[in-house]
Amino acid sequence: MIFKETKLQGAFIIEPEMLIDERGAFARTFCCRDFENHGLNGNVSQCSISLNTKKNTLRGMHYQKKPYAEAKLVRCSRGFIYDVIVDLRYDSSTFKEWTSIEISAENRKMV
């Protein structure tokens, strides 16, 4: 997996490395060790899927305070997502900054 830093402290664009052969393709989408090597929480406590039945569906911001804070990994298995990240961590050097990325089934990016 290739981790690319965003302008936000601790937020990455993650691109899986595709292994392709005559059978098709394989890619790792999560590895605890890789996440921890980039300062991310590798302890997965939940995995969820969201299905939007209409185009242009808007979903809300997700926010948790300590001790309930969660690391998130967002990917798109069909269509595309315009994902916005806002840094609301008071102790962060990028507090109140934001960034966005288009994530799609085609580009395989995760954030």
Predicted feature descriptions by range:
Residues M1-E106:
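Non-catalytic, conserved peripheral segments adjacent to functional cores
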Residues R108-V111:
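Short, intrinsically disordered, charge-balanced linker/junction segments flanking boundaries
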